[in-house]
Amino acid sequence: MRIGPVELSAVKDWDPAPGVLVSWHPTPASCAKALAAPVSAVPPSYVQARQIRSFSEQAARGLDHSRLLIASVEVFGHCDLRAMTYVINAHLRRHDTYRSWFELRDTDHIVRHSIADPADIEFVPTTHGEMTSADLRQHIVATPDSLHWDCFSFGVIQRADSFTFYASIDHLHADGQFVGVGLMEFQSMYTALIMGEPPIGLSEAGSYVDFCVRQHEYTSALTVDSPEVRAWIDFAEINNGTFPEFPLPLGDPSVRCGGDLLSMMLMDEQQTQRFESACMAANARFIGGILACIAIAIHELTGADTYFGITPKDIRTPADLMTQGWFTGQIPVTVPVAGLSFNEIARIAQTSFDTGADLAKVPFERVVELSPSLRRPQPLFSLVNFFDAQVGPLSAVTKLFEGLNVGTYSDGRVTYPLSTMVGRFDETAASVLFPDNPVARESVTAYLRAIRSVCMRIANGGTAERVGNVVALSPGRRNNIERMTWRSCRAGDFIDICNLKVANVTVDREA
């Protein structure tokens, strides 16, 4: 799947041309200092703790957990190894997330060790000689796992007149912003040095460790009666006490398999433009329309009259904009579909997304701590990511990398969430990360085809078509959905949810 100049694919589908590999890893002295680093009082962020727990739980089942963010960019010319060594070490010393490693003592006790002096981090280049595409991929995904300090590595693949720069970083220390801000940082520092200029001054990097402190101060003040916590509890209780599962079969989870990524074009450029117009006519944005289409597609595949989804949100503050780290929260989305038109569904989906934005600051694991009857997110919970390269901040990234080949790759291991990624540039495409087995592949193929079918119908003028009623709701489930939907609406919103409620809402969002 391509989003502007950025190609999103599985690493097995990446075919870098053979070349001489030079990779950067820490010196033995750096590794020794990291291993001796004292315990820090700063806990991991909630999303870091989730990654460490899920990695360990999957390993105990004999499964290889997906963990790496891999990004690459093609560069003309020969790599100046001395300049690149400087840039890599400057990057690692600039961002304090790289000074930490984590020790899992038990499921509820994860300890951070922290390197005091950033100068103790030193990466040096190693030349490996000519490698084939397959050998290159194997080397890049062999970056140490989440329980090692050096769970990040960098390299270049040198060819006659160009090279590929890559970064292979454990998600503990990076999120999708690295593909833009991180690569831009590398590019600007490297370009200045090879042009004979002194090292450039970069914007203040901020501190991921400070974010972890702020997050735990905020979550410690929450109670079971906090409105954001109550909203999460309401959502979880209607989904068996946790995040919603993907609604189609995914095969036997006890059978070991890797992960794969399946992509499909949803709409061409003209259809995308018409679809956006349909969203605007429904008083929704593109993301509201996409969530509506996913909800309708799930209804057509399963008969589910209400879609429950999770979508991630970057929770950086303005002070964190240049900070390297994992700043991802989740928003719960509730979208009734039965008996409604696309216009109504898209507007409800948009309202649910917008009014749920504050919930991204509340990690679900904290909600589970406050309400122990709930359960932490289970493997293969359903997650929907949306990337719009027509608006900021992605629009700036696409302009920056215009004319270059930029890639970001899944590492081919078992995914924890089942992630649906929808990307919009001129065209609109979707990719799904899923367990690589025949049952899951069949389900994901049907799922993507259903989404494509709905999107095309809307783009071709089918906004007035109403979704048929399929399954009647039990009284208890009806009450829960009614409560969830009212919570997701603003004053004045008109709701026509099948036979549940018809009202012009005059209550506030916490009613």
UniProtKB/Swiss-Prot annotation:
Per its record, the protein catalyses:
a (hydroxy)phthioceranyl-[(hydroxy)phthioceranic acid synthase] + 2'-palmitoyl/stearoyl-2-O-sulfo-alpha,alpha-trehalose = a 3'-(hydroxy)phthioceranyl-2'-palmitoyl/stearoyl-2-O-sulfo-alpha,alpha-trehalose + holo-[(hydroxy)phthioceranic acid synthase]
Q: What is its EC number?
A: 2.3.1.283
Question: One biological-process term from Gene Ontology?
Answer: cell wall organization
The highest taxon in the source lineage is: Bacteria
What keywords would UniProt list here? Acyltransferase, Cell wall biogenesis/degradation, Lipid biosynthesis, Lipid metabolism, Transferase
Gene3D superfamilies named among the record's database cross-references: Chloramphenicol acetyltransferase-like domain, Nonribosomal peptide synthetase, condensation domain
Q: Which GO terms describe its molecular function?
A: acyltransferase activity
Role summary: Required for the biosynthesis of sulfolipid-1 (SL-1), a major mycobacterial cell wall lipid. Catalyzes the acylation of trehalose-2-sulfate-2'-palmitate (SL659) by adding the (hydroxy)phthioceranoyl group at the 3'-position to yield the diacylated intermediate 2-palmitoyl-3-(C43)-phthioceranyl-alpha, alpha'-D-trehalose-2'-sulfate (SL1278).
Membership in a protein family = Belongs to the PapA acyltransferase family.
Quote the protein name from its UniProt record: 2'-acyl-2-O-sulfo-trehalose (hydroxy)phthioceranyltransferase PapA1
Q: Which organism is it from?
A: Mycobacterium tuberculosis (strain CDC 1551 / Oshkosh)
Originating gene: papA1
